[in-house]
UniProtKB/Swiss-Prot annotation:
The gene is Mtfmt. NCBIfam families: fmt. One of its GO terms (cellular component) is mitochondrion. It comes from Rattus norvegicus. Methionyl-tRNA formyltransferase that formylates methionyl-tRNA in mitochondria and is crucial for translation initiation. The lineage of its organism: Eukaryota, Metazoa, Chordata, Craniata, Vertebrata. This is Methionyl-tRNA formyltransferase, mitochondrial. It holds the Pfam family Formyl_trans_C. One of its GO terms (molecular function) is methionyl-tRNA formyltransferase activity.
Amino acid sequence: MLLPRRCWGPWLAGRRPRCSCQSPAGFSGKDRRSSRVREKPPWRVLFFGTDHFAREALRALHAARDNKEEKLIEKLEVVTVPSISPKGLPVKQYAIQSQLPVYEWPDMGSGEYDVGVVASFGRLLSEALILKFPYGILNVHPSCLPRWRGPAPIIHTVLHGDTVTGVTIMQVRPKRFDVGPILKQETVAVPPKSTSKELEAVLSKLGANMLISVLKNLPESLNNGRPQPAEGVTYAPKVSAGTSCVKWEEQTSEQVLRLHLAIGDIVPLQTLWMENTVKLLDLVEVNNSILADPKVMGQTVTPGSVVYHRPSQMLLVHCKDGWIGVRSIMHKKTLTATDFYNGYLHAWYQKNSHAYPSQCKFQTLRLPTKTQQKTKLLLCSALSS
């Protein structure tokens, strides 16, 4: 007979494993040890999650519960976190629509479960909580750990131009995020020019399928878990509002485009135009034919310089090393590049007829610390909406 606790690794070293014939204590704090620990499916699962990535894993668990022939999941309940959105986070929405029992952290009901599953939950789980599950808690993480530990792995994958990523199913350990043994890991190529949301859709389906595969052979998967490599550890911290402020003097055109792909769907990139905040909505790479245009090549420019390129109907903005194209912006209202030229750039040139073109420029926006902290909360909410 497999002892679930034996699979938990060195963090329980020196402790005697609990008898495998006992089920975990209930979440009400009462001792609920009347039933034996199951050696095989169907499992009783408590799911912890928040966002769209987590919702796909929950959807797969729900489908498995409803599949009476396969008998993989017998019981499925959900824990999520409070949200500033009246309708709640995607996981809560799905749970309610699917008539699954749902609790708001730290409430977890009082049921008995065999295994916990975490995806995009954002809360450290205590050792006492983990020990309530005979088979521990599994984490579905959208990166190839140990690369991109932390709350924003998909954003950092895109931001840093990774060409390969993946999903890791690992065991949760207390006190630290994303450090437990790897049970299953699969890689996938990052589609060129994909946004974080597009990549999330790919990884969420992969992760959901991997989770079901692990649950089908749970005791064996736990016994075969391997420690994460000590090399190649990187971290993916939360993104703040300040990240969206383009630093024209410091960032290359490739870095600005990656930043747009990474967070543009969530919070648009920001800059200053004549002391007014402007949001850059649609950014594109500038092709060689535009760069070869004498009207572009002949300009004396500095980082932030703005030129309207009539043939492509784009604003060209100079970064640290070259140009990036902007097709639309938000300046009081949404404007195409042509609208912005007609309403603002052309007027600037008329008013400053003797100025150098390099003086017509966007400037780096510096957000106050309080604004960054406030917007960080809103951004975290947007990431899960």
